[in-house]
Amino acid sequence: MEKFKKVLLIDDDDIVNSINSVIIKHAKFADEVDTINNVPNALEFLNEAKSKGNSPDVIFLDLNMPGLDGWDFMDEYEKLEIKESSKVVMLTSSISSKDEERAASSNYITAFISKPLSPELLESIYESHLA
């Protein structure tokens, strides 16, 4: 599996972010892992990263978050200029077929994956969607 330079985790649950960060680092999936727990901060982070030329290679995005959710993030993400350089993987507990269909119809969502993240799932995501 190729190592990515930078991964961004967006999930309102800080414990989930911490666990996923450890899994990604342990699997040597990325050199750097940033975690953010809400959509406004994630969008601000991406704008700053873009201006510094340091956008994440992969964004793992939770769908169900209080306030602005994953779909709200995607609405704003589609307006950003980094969308061609970052791959979005929706990592969610949603079992809604409507969410899955909406993700499949998006030009910017690379994969719709059910939580929890594991080293094996990370490898599968890479092989199926990111390689």
Language-model-derived ranges and their functions:
Residues K5-I15, N20-I24:
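Conserved acidic segment of CheY-like receiver
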Residues T35-E44, E48, G70:
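Helix N-cap/capping motif at the beta->alpha junctions
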Residues D62:
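Active-site residues of response regulator receiver
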Residues M65:
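Receiver (REC) domain active-site loop signature in two-component systems and cognate sites
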Residues W71-I82:
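Short amphipathic alpha-helix used as the core "switch/output" element in two-component signaling
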Residues D72, S85, I95-A111, S124:
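Alpha4 helix (beta4-alpha4-beta5 surface) of REC/receiver domains from two-component response regulators
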Residues L91-T92:
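Hydrophobic/aromatic residues positioned on beta-strands within the core alpha/beta folds
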Residues S114-K115:
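A Lys-centered signature of the CheY-like receiver
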